[in-house]
Regions:
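Structural alpha/beta surface segment adjacent to cysteine/selenocysteine redox centers
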Residues: 38, 42-142, 254-341, 421-422, ...
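Alpha-helical membrane-targeting segments
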Residues: 1-25
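Residue-level preference for long, well-ordered alpha-helices that form the structural scaffold
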Residues: 81-84, 88, 160, 249, ...
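Aromatic-flanked redox-active Cys/Sec active sites in thiol-based oxidoreductases
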Residues: 35-40, 245-250
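C-terminal cap of thioredoxin/glutaredoxin-like
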Residues: 3-4, 11-12, 28-32, 43-55, ...
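Short hydrophobic/aromatic-rich motifs at helix boundaries and adjacent loops
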Residues: 21-23, 61-66, 169-171, 231-233, ...
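Alpha-helical context
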Residues: 22, 26-30, 68, 72, ...
Length: 435
């Protein structure tokens, strides 16, 4: 590891974390823009929030600018187009259930003819502002709820009675859009996952006229969905298991592992299994994002020393040198030393200190690189677009999700499992009464 990184990372990271937060006032001259694709399921979910957002924007932020692209971008994490499409449909279904979006029980990608008809309707309509957003929401409903008859009727009317319109706040182009996102002052916000963060930013700058109410069932950090003792016992008795596939050089791995271990594992009796991955180059991360997540999740962070490939390998060697039943505590301690004490496991002095702290007398003789490659392979089989990857097993069901944006799913799944359990018990009781 670079001596500069070992010396200066802990100093810089501590300063960055502790410096007074002066909320930068972002320029508003470009307004607020949302980028959509008619064949993007996240755009469909976002479209259901836009009329409300437009309604509470201040006059200087109106109108909300809409860019509709017909060009997708390459799927993340080397996923195939089909894998990405299926992932998005499944994920959107989960989001729609959690936040009560309108969504079809068996969603399908709209066909090319329907997409062309939808674009024609939106190009031809003379409606503007909130009226246009309501129309666009209706058009998205027709596309994604398989209401093709309604779409054809509206298309015929639009083609017959209106010409193509040209409004500055409505743009049709080929900007590559992977999934819907907002743009404000050259900053991007994912249209669903970052909507609350965007709303907080707009509220801080007094760019909203009313309190934003989006994603009504959002689960905050350190907030538990289940607090009733009887319900809690039900979940604990099901012995849930959670596999975590983590890149050791990624601070999000530490923040999520620490949060889950400290806040959820004992509370819900979750057995945690850790699968470290080979170096993915995630030490070049967004310091602001990691700092913000640390403060919101109340997980200690900094001073840190960003691990290199060699440091990640050394961390994995320590992890696999302790007995299996001690590996969770070992990984927690290794990551804690790196991300809150500024230790560099590729530096022999720090490595030896970690080894003593973990009571490791003999280092493993396993081929660590090979072991990490095996974990990589298992992780890739989960077909997830980002890290960390999580797999939760409970009540003979398995649920796979990923990243800091989906940690709330752990508690949401538990709540749904309880709901199904009680529903099944009630049905059984009703059947017994009949007999």
């Amino acid at each position: 590891m670079s001596l500069l990184r070992r010396w200066f990372d802990p100093i810089r990271s501590s300063w960055f974390y502790q410096k007074p937060v002066r909320q930068e006032v972002l320029p508003t001259d470009q307004g607020l823009t949302i980028y959509l694709r008619l064949d993007d399921v996240y755009s469909y979910l976002a479209a259901q929030q836009l009329p409300q957002l437009e309604e509470i924007l201040t006059d200087e932020m109106k109108p909300l600018k809409v860019v509709i692209s017909n060009q997708t971008a390459s799927p993340p994490n080397e996923m195939s187009a089909l894998e990405w499409q299926q992932y998005c449909l499944n994920d959107a279904k989960i989001l729609s259930k959690q936040h009560r979006f309108s969504f079809h029980e068996t969603p399908e990608q709209p066909n090319a003819e329907a997409l062309q008809q939808a674009e024609t309707i939106l190009r031809h309509t003379p409606l503007r502002g909130q009226d246009f957003l309501y129309l666009m929401e209706d058009v998205f409903h027709m596309l994604w709820q398989k209401q093709y008859g309604k779409l054809r009727t509206l298309h015929a009317m639009a083609s017959r009675h209106h010409q193509v319109q040209n409004f500055p706040e409505r743009v049709f182009n080929q900007t590559p859009v992977l999934s819907a996102y907002f743009e404000f002052a050259d900053r991007k916000y994912q249209a669903v996952d970052d909507l609350l963060r965007l709303a907080r930013r707009l509220e801080q700058q007094k760019l909203l006229t009313d309190n934003p109410i989006f994603l009504i069932n959002h689960i905050e950090w350190r907030e538990h969905l289940i607090s009733d003792a009887e319900e809690l016992n039900e979940i604990q008795a099901l012995d849930p298991e959670l596999d975590l596939y983590i890149a050791l050089e990624d601070p999000i791995s530490w923040l999520l592992l620490a949060y889950i271990k400290e806040e959820l594992a004992d509370y819900y009796n979750i057995q945690l299994n850790i699968y470290p991955l080979s170096y993915h180059g995630r030490d070049q991360f967004d310091w602001s994002l990691a700092t913000r997540l640390s403060k919101r999740s109340e997980v200690k962070f900094t001073p840190f020393c960003r691990p290199t490939a060699a440091a990640s390998l050394a961390m994995a060697e320590l992890f696999y040198s302790v007995p299996a039943e001690q590996q969770l505590e070992a990984m927690y301690e290794i990551l804690r030393q790196v991300w809150t004490k500024g230790k560099d496991p590729s530096f022999k002095t720090h490595f030896d200190q970690l080894r003593r702290d973990l009571n490791i007398e003999q280092l493993t003789e396993q081929d660590i690189s090979l072991r990490l490659q095996q974990n990589d392979m298992y992780c890739e089989m989960k077909s997830q677009p980002s890290l960390p990857v999580l797999e939760l097993r409970i009540a003979e069901q398995s649920y796979v999700f990923n990243s800091l944006y989906r940690v709330w799913m752990i508690e949401s799944i538990f709540s749904n499992v309880l709901e199904e359990l009680y529903k099944s018990e009630n049905e059984s009781e009703n059947e017994q009464r009949k007999t």
